[in-house]
């Protein structure tokens, strides 16, 4: 048992079941899955994070790439939907990861960009809370994967290939 397996087992049971169910459905509807995540920084260097209504913890905004979408189309759609954010810089592809959560076929493209928020994001059916945070003062319950990505982005940790 490795560290990644231990971390996955530490998730609440209902979260593990939901993730497995989604990947089971994707097994029959998609050959491989591809998603985007965005490390969105404001002009003060703060990172934008979201809390979902259906998963515990704080995450980088993002989601799946749908048929007919490019990575950048999906990225702009997700930051708009999850945070009322607009790109203030050209998104830079930081790394592409293999996400072993639920399957061995899910890839996540992580982009870094500077953003502006058109209006504060109000809670909805998907996002219960969101905001910009200083990297030195992150909220409680930031997911381990999100913390690892932030450490990689800042140069404090080596980049790994697994989400």
Predicted features, each with a name:
Residues 2-37:
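Acidic, metal-coordinating catalytic segment for phosphate/diphosphate chemistry
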Residues 5, 56-57, 125-163:
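Nudix hydrolase/Nudix homology domain
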Residues 40, 110-114, 134:
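Short, well-ordered beta-strand micro-motif
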Residues 42-82:
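Conserved Nudix-box catalytic region and its N-terminal flanking loop in Nudix hydrolases
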Residues 84-85, 132:
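Glycine-centered C-terminal helix-capping/turn motifs at helix ends
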Residues 86-95:
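A short coil-to-beta-strand element that immediately follows conserved catalytic motifs
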Residues 96-120, 146:
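Active-site-adjacent beta-strand/loop module that shapes the phosphate/pyrophosphate-binding cleft
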